[in-house]
């Protein structure tokens, strides 16, 4: 069987990399010939999880058509979040938990998406449906993905299925998920050593919102005031990146993983700022707004913005 590559979105997080690894194992057990790769380097949080459960970071690829004819996607489907030459290969499988947007294929494919907190939760269901045993290290990396995406089950994206998956995967992996989860999240909050340019690209995704192209980046911290000491530098870097890449607006969501609130920095024209205010009921003051209880880009940021821009 010809080889297929499995990967998550650009600027990969723990779900994108962890689920790619786990899905590659799953598919190889079913006779496929797959390799998990990544569209960017593993971040600090993901590196912590990989080391904890004995995995090497997947190799990074910029293109895929030079290697394979077919690919499998996890944790994304939108083309602007995927590999740049995706239109030159066949997508055979997708496992996701996001909205479906700008996605089309010539041939039928396997597509499974559910409104749960993490793609690894969907994969956990697939393991159970087929009565497949999950190795301890695979369980550990899937557990890490769910903890990361749901902020240790505190995110509003969290479902009962996510909670059940975490309980079961933690037992298989042999860890206390609450203790390990806090260690994992804290591993991803050390932003002091990174430049503002790195931080606004670390976990950033592009979205089509009505007629606007938006870039929405997110960083997790335990000290928001410390992060905001670099506010002017963040805004300057966002402005530069928006102009260079043709983004109509750029949002940086600084999320406190301990109290589940976010501070937003925003670059955009007056129309976009007005739509932001309409979407969240908050006026931007000096390009900044406080969004209490908002932690999920997928569920709490993109949907209200989409509705507001399309109204």
UniProtKB/Swiss-Prot annotation:
Record GO cellular component, one term: cytoplasm
Q: Has the keyword GTP-binding been applied to this entry?
A: no
Q: Major place of localization?
A: cytoplasm
Q: Binding residues for Mn(2+) 1, per the UniProt record?
A: 9, 13, 75
- Report the domain of life of the source organism: Bacteria
What is the name of this protein?
Probable manganese-dependent inorganic pyrophosphatase
Q: Does the keyword Hydrolase feature in the UniProt annotation?
A: yes
Q: What are the alphabetically sorted keywords of the record? A: Cytoplasm, Hydrolase, Manganese, Metal-binding
Q: What does the note under cofactor report? A: Binds 2 manganese ions per subunit.
Q: Which residues form the signal peptide?
A: none
UniProt lists the family membership as follows: Belongs to the PPase class C family.
Task: Recall the taxonomic lineage recorded for the source organism.
Answer: Bacteria, Bacillati, Bacillota, Bacilli, Lactobacillales
